[in-house]
């Protein structure tokens, strides 16, 4: 099993898919990495040589922000928005959707489970 950036890549998947197991790498970025390193998209992870693994590791470390570094950067961006008091920061602080989605209905993922309000009855 190849290990890149602290993530074990699945052995039997194609490299194009296996690289997406790393936080910060999606399909498009995965294809760019493989093209830059000259590794076939259809190659399976178990067929990689040590040189190819090293080549992938060097490329990712040198050119991309992934895993822990990227997570820290995203958290820092959210903290900064909260501190400066911008609209997005306020939405983060209140636990509401940040990007303009409706909240009269839906938004349950962001708001959490429903809280019943005492004394409020349904109109007939």
Curated annotation (Swiss-Prot):
What role is this protein assigned?
A: Located at the top of the head of the 30S subunit, it contacts several helices of the 16S rRNA. In the 70S ribosome it contacts the 23S rRNA (bridge B1a) and protein L5 of the 50S subunit (bridge B1b), connecting the 2 subunits; these bridges are implicated in subunit movement. Contacts the tRNAs in the A and P-sites.
Report the superkingdom from the record: Bacteria
Signal peptide region: none
Read off the HAMAP family from this record.
Ribosomal_uS13
**Protein name (record):** Small ribosomal subunit protein uS13
Which InterPro entries does the record associate with it? Rbsml_uS13_C, Ribosomal_uS13, Ribosomal_uS13-like_H2TH, Ribosomal_uS13_bac-type, Ribosomal_uS13_CS
The UniProt keywords, alphabetically, are:
Ribonucleoprotein, Ribosomal protein, RNA-binding, rRNA-binding, tRNA-binding
Which GO BP annotation is one of this protein's?
translation
Q: Which GO terms describe its molecular function?
A: rRNA binding; structural constituent of ribosome; tRNA binding
């Amino acid at each position: 099993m190849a290990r890149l950036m602290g993530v074990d890549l699945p052995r039997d998947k194609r490299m194009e898919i296996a690289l997406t197991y790393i936080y910060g790498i999606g399909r498009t970025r995965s294809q760019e990495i493989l093209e830059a390193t000259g590794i076939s998209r259809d190659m399976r992870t178990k067929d990689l040589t040590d040189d190819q693994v090293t080549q992938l590791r060097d490329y990712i470390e040198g050119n991309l922000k992934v895993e822990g570094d990227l997570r820290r950067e995203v958290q820092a961006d959210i903290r900064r928005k909260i501190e400066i008091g911008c609209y997005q920061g306020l939405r983060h602080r209140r636990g509401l959707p940040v990007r303009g989605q409706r909240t009269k209905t839906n938004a349950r993922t962001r708001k959490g489970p429903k809280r019943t309000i005492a004394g409020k009855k349904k109109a007939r």
